[in-house]
Amino acid sequence: MNSSALPHVTIFTDGACSGNPGPGGWGAILRFGEIEKELKGGEPHTTNNRMELLAAISALEALKKAASVDLTTDSQYVRQGITSWIHNWKRNGWRTADKKPVKNADLWQRLDTALQPHQVRWHWIKGHAGHDENERADQLAREGVALARLK
């Protein structure tokens, strides 16, 4: 499908954890034209990498129809995993090069599925470096940690 025919959505995501593992949260900002939506959530016992993945997954799953997406994360783990490592993992039956099971394979598989209807361009920015949207996603993720503590 021609990406210019698809609606364009900009997404910023972040994950946070208090202790690793520990209570964690994720946050996402979705922008479509003038419309902006904020998402957040958390889990009582998780890792930072799982929260980074869940932020991207939740944002993509929130899209109701196919879109051209620019997704920005401060997680090299997510960006490298989805743009590079996942191809070999899938080919190797969700095992790493040294034949160990891929960590967080459940979420990588869910992210892979969430991507399917969309054309996604992945962007990385340095976290805590004054990027307004990343700072807001971080705040949402920290609110998610607070929610997780209540569970």
Curated annotation (Swiss-Prot):
Q: A Gene Ontology CC term for this entry?
A: cytoplasm
First-listed, main subcellular location of the protein, grouped into a coarse class: cytoplasm
Q: Where is the RNase H type-1 domain?
A: 5-146
Query: Coiled-coil segments, which residues?
Result: none
| One Pfam family of this chain | RNase_H
Annotated binding of Mg(2+) 2, by residue: 14, 138
* Substrates-to-products reaction catalysed: Endonucleolytic cleavage to 5'-phosphomonoester
* Classification via PROSITE patterns: RNASE_H_1
InterPro entries assigned: RNase_H, RNaseH-like_sf, RNaseH_domain, RNaseH_sf, RNaseHI
Localisation: Cytoplasm
Q: Which amino acids does the record list as binding Mg(2+) 1?
A: 14, 52, 74
What GO molecular functions are on record for this protein?
magnesium ion binding; nucleic acid binding; RNA-DNA hybrid ribonuclease activity
- Needed co-factor(s): Mg(2+)
Q: Does the keyword Nuclease apply?
A: yes
Q: What role does this protein play?
A: Endonuclease that specifically degrades the RNA of RNA-DNA hybrids.
Record-linked PANTHER family: RIBONUCLEASE H1
Q: What is this protein called?
A: Ribonuclease H
Give the taxonomic lineage as stored in the record. Answer: Bacteria, Pseudomonadati, Pseudomonadota, Alphaproteobacteria, Hyphomicrobiales
Q: Which gene encodes it?
A: rnhA
